[in-house]
Structures are given as C-alpha cells and as structure tokens.
Amino acid sequence: MSIRPNWQAATLLQAEETSITSAHTGRTYRIQAAALGERPAGGYPVLYILDGDAFFPAILNMAQSLLINPITKSHAACLIVGIGYTGGTIRDLSQRALDYTPPLPDNAPESERKQYGQADRFSRFINDELSALLDSKYRIDTQNQAVFGHSFGALYGLYSLFTRPERFRHYLLVSPSIWWQDRRVLDWLPDTLPQGIGIRLGAGEHEGRNNRPDQTSSGMVAQAKILAGTLHHLGADVRFTLYPNANHGNAPFYALTDCIEYLRNVWQR
C-alpha cells in the first residue's frame, strides 16, 4: 500500500493573523495575534512584538507555558501581537529601518531620509490604527501595554520611552542600537520618567566584541549598561542583563524567558 502524505502549511495553536495597510506609513503589516487566559474586565494587557515575523512564534510558545501561575495553574491574561511585514521574509530590513529609527537631523541627505527616520509615523500606526483593530476584536487595556524589541526594534523602544513613555508600561529591549546616527536617540533622553514604568535591557556577552565599523566594540554592551544606570538615576524601574555566550543574533532568544517571566509577575492575577 502506498502512502501519499498530504502536506499542509503548519499553524500556530491559538494564533490568528491578518494584514493592515497604514495610512500613516503607507506600508502593509502582517499582524499575528493570540489571546491567552480569561479576558479581564478592563481588557487584555498587550505585548507588542517588533520584528514579529522572527519572534512571534517563539514568544507565543514560551508564553503558553511560562505565563501559567505554578500554584493556581491559571494563565495570566494577555494578548500577544506580532508586528511584521507581508514580504515573506523573517526580517524586512528596509521597512524595519524606516519604522524603527528616530527622526533624522534637519540637514540629513535625501538618500538617508528614504531609508530611515519614520518612528513617529510608526507610532501613530500603532496608536491610531492597530490598537483600534485589536480592540474591536479582542478588547484591550491600552493603559497596560508592553513592547519587545531587538536591535533597531529596541532602538524604537528607547525612542518611545524617551518621547512618550506612557505609550507602553513595560519596555523589554534587547541589544538596543544606541550607536545609530552617533547615538542620536540620546538627544531625546528626558530629565524625568513617570512612575510605574518597567524597563528591562539586555545584550549578549559577545556583542561587546563587535568589529563592524558602524558599531564600535564598546558600543552595544557598554552603552546599554551606561543607559541602564542613567535611567536608574532618573528613578526608573530598570534592570540590565548580560547574557553569557550570546551574540547579536541569538541574544533576544536568551532574553525571552526573562521577558516572559517578568510579564507573568506583573500580569498574573
């Protein structure tokens, strides 16, 4: 007897996806979402995952296991949302560079403006369009949101923290590209931060040995450590973690467990 397997595309349990074209950025986004636990009266807390095409599957699988209270066995309620692109790649380098980088200086050449500097537009997409879409389907708590970002995604997280810190309550940022444009993001570093915001910064041990010309060897790790200290002096709830044996590519996966366990502690009821 011959067997002819009927191969089909794999699916993620509990996950759904759609696409949305933003009027603010002009780009089309692949949105993956999964609602876990019983929805609270005030709506689901939300974890936004930047580079969602790369990280949503891993974070969802970990959250399904690690967001469970070990005593009550109840699942911390949350909506996990991956923000990606529709081009079919793990990372769309050109689109993420536009979305995740802060505004360029006024004298920046037009060639750079075509590649970078649209973080404000991307923020309006999240605030005005994506949040409304999610709320209409799931009902969300817009006062209790978190963001996970890596590299340029973490740079976007820092820019949001510095300019509109109330946009998210929890910032989970790994290997932030503070070096970009001669550390331009630090131009927005505030004098104070609101109470009640949690910041978790991380980097891989081997990122401190980076020899790329656009990232000095002292950049990724040392600058993240220095920034954590600065934010601490501003009164922020901040913690920096250095992941042994991790490099820029795998550091976010080392950090995922810490990020999910942090959210379990703040979101568990």
List each model region and its residues.
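The feature captures the conserved acid-bearing segment of alpha/beta-hydrolase catalytic domains
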Residues: 179-246
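Conserved acidic catalytic loop of the alpha/beta-hydrolase fold
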Residues: 124-142
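A domain-start/cap signature at the N-terminus of enzymes
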Residues: 1-45, 79
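Structural cue for short, hydrophobic secondary-structure segments
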Residues: 49-51, 82
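Alpha/beta-hydrolase fold nucleophile elbow
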Residues: 139-150, 171
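Short glycine-enriched nucleophile-adjacent loop
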Residues: 154-165
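Active-site machinery of serine-nucleophile hydrolases
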Residues: 56-123
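A conserved short beta-strand
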Residues: 166-178, 198
